[in-house]
Amino acid sequence: MLKPSLNAAAKWMIRNTIVSNESLTPEINLHLITIASPLWMSTPDACPLPDPYWAFYWPGGQGLSRFILDNKPLFQGSEIVDFGAGCGSASISASICGAKKILANDIDRYALLSTKLNFHLNNLRDSKIQYSSINFLDDKNERMSTQFFTDSKNIRKFILLGDMFYDSDFAELLFSWLKKIQDAHMVRVLVGDPDRHPLAESEYLQRYKTKFTKNQLAEFSLPGYVIKEHYGFNTAKVFELKFQ
């Protein structure tokens, strides 16, 4: 598949997605492929961009973004890394709440483009947001992934992850990296997830080499249309992970 230029991709996204706020976060508008979109039932060849996961508002991202918006004082003046940013909802929510500095990270450059378009859609200045497609889980990029956070102990720091736990092998890599960042910068790790197996079931949790505690901060009931769009998950939960 030939990959379109970013300019061509932006035009395609705007033309072929629906601007929607039908979610747990009606304050936020997003360019999405929803059940009301002609692309919903299309075959993959109808989309010139590979795997447009960034055009869907996944349950964990909805729950995490709702939690951020509901806890504005916690995120005001903070430093944020939105890991696996996708559509950018967590970054947008943090910006609305007054985060001081935001890094939207996704290895797919079209996801970062989607995040940027959604920032503009919500009339947010993106001067305080940085975009990076660096794979932070690659050992050679470890130093780069720690440079974003300041050394100040007076600034709250967060890594935000929505819907990242589909696979236990990937989760193991992710936990190892998160522990390094948390140890180095006293970063809080917040996760939005609808209880997918790698983060929910004890047989997986006991097997991971990197040990952590999982504290549930919130649980949100998903609207019926979200349940229908996302494989029957009924709720989205927000957890804080503390590594040992």
UniProtKB/Swiss-Prot annotation:
Cellular component, GO annotation: mitochondrial matrix
Residues passing through the membrane, by range: none
Superkingdom, natural source: Eukaryota
A GO term, aspect molecular function: protein-lysine N-methyltransferase activity
Pfam family, one: PrmA
GO biological process terms held by the UniProt record: methylation; negative regulation of fatty acid beta-oxidation using acyl-CoA dehydrogenase
Record bears the keyword Lipid metabolism: no
Family matches, as InterPro entries: Ribosomal_L11_MeTrfase_PrmA, SAM-dependent_MTases_sf
EC number: 2.1.1.-
Keywords, in A-Z order: Methyltransferase, Transferase
Family: Belongs to the methyltransferase superfamily. ETFBKMT family.
Role played: Probable methyltransferase.
PANTHER family hit by this protein: ELECTRON TRANSFER FLAVOPROTEIN BETA SUBUNIT LYSINE METHYLTRANSFERASE
Name this polypeptide is given: Electron transfer flavoprotein beta subunit lysine methyltransferase homolog
Organism: Caenorhabditis elegans
Source lineage: Eukaryota, Metazoa, Ecdysozoa, Nematoda, Chromadorea
